[in-house]
Structures are given as C-alpha cells and as structure tokens.
Amino acid sequence: MPRKGPAPKRPVVADPVYGAPIVSQLVNKILLDGKKGLAERIVYDALAGVAAKNGQDAVVTLKKALDNVRPALEVRSRRVGGSTYQVPIEVKPHRANTLALRWLTTYAKSRREKTMTERLTNEILDASNGLGAAVKRREDTHKMAESNKAFAHYRW
C-alpha cells in the first residue's frame, strides 16, 4: 500500500462541445482501447440523435436519464459470525453517478440496435422516460435493499 495516502481526486474536465463534465465522463465510460476520438464521435452523435428525437436539449435529457438511473441505496456483503448478510447502505453521490453511467453504457451495449450510437441514443431516451434496462437495474437494486432492510443495523 502507498504510504503517501490516497491519491487526490482530480476535477472532471468539461467536454469541449457541450461544456458539461457529465458528457466527458460518459465519453470515458464508452472509451475502448484508447480510441477516444471514436468514443467522442459515438457520444456526440448519440446526443445529437437524442436532441433530434426528443426536441429538447441533449444534456438536459442526459441529466434526467441519469437521475432516473442513479441509485440511492445498494447492498454490501457483511460477514457477522458465521453468516454473510446483505446490508443495505446509502450510496455516496460520486459512486451513484459512476454506477448510473456504468449501467447506462452497459445496457446500451447489450441492446439490439445496429450501431452503438443508436443503442446509446435509445437507452438515454428510455432512461429519461423512466424505462429501459438501466432503470430496471436501479429498481432491482432498491428492491434488494428494501428486502434486506432488517439487516440495516449491521451498517458500518
């Protein structure tokens, strides 16, 4: 383990086109094999598609989609005695944002549309309307936390 302490958190640089840090985080989540230009093209085309289909600002729609996907609770495994309990805990804002972006991109990749741009466009639109696999994942996570509420006193 390093002796200097934890690495400092670096501020997220806003992306050059929309001027929103959340867009650059989405680009970094889409990024594969260091091909940032390709990732930027996918995200920008997807956001242009969102604006065209929705008729609203793409960044506003993306933020609404992330609000619908962002979890408030999750479960963590905690070993007490000989048994392991799923303990519900509140999710910190930074982790909630990261999970929302991760789920959005993961479920966009698993969609059936032909191009990644179309998949991401439709997943963002579905999530902003409260539909889609990413929103379902959040609901499942909340349901799991709700059903394990009895073990909340094991929180640490």
Curated annotation (Swiss-Prot):
GO terms for cellular component: small ribosomal subunit. It comes from the Bacteria. Part of the 30S ribosomal subunit. Contacts proteins S9 and S11. GO terms for molecular function: rRNA binding; structural constituent of ribosome; tRNA binding. InterPro entries: Ribosomal_uS7 (IPR000235), Ribosomal_uS7_bac/org-type (IPR005717), Ribosomal_uS7_dom (IPR023798), Ribosomal_uS7_dom_sf (IPR036823). Keywords: Ribonucleoprotein, Ribosomal protein, RNA-binding, rRNA-binding, tRNA-binding. One of its GO terms (biological process) is translation. Belongs to the universal ribosomal protein uS7 family. SUPFAM superfamilies: Ribosomal protein S7. NCBIfam families: rpsG_bact. This is Small ribosomal subunit protein uS7. Disulfide bonds: none annotated. One of the primary rRNA binding proteins, it binds directly to 16S rRNA where it nucleates assembly of the head domain of the 30S subunit. Is located at the subunit interface close to the decoding center, probably blocks exit of the E-site tRNA.
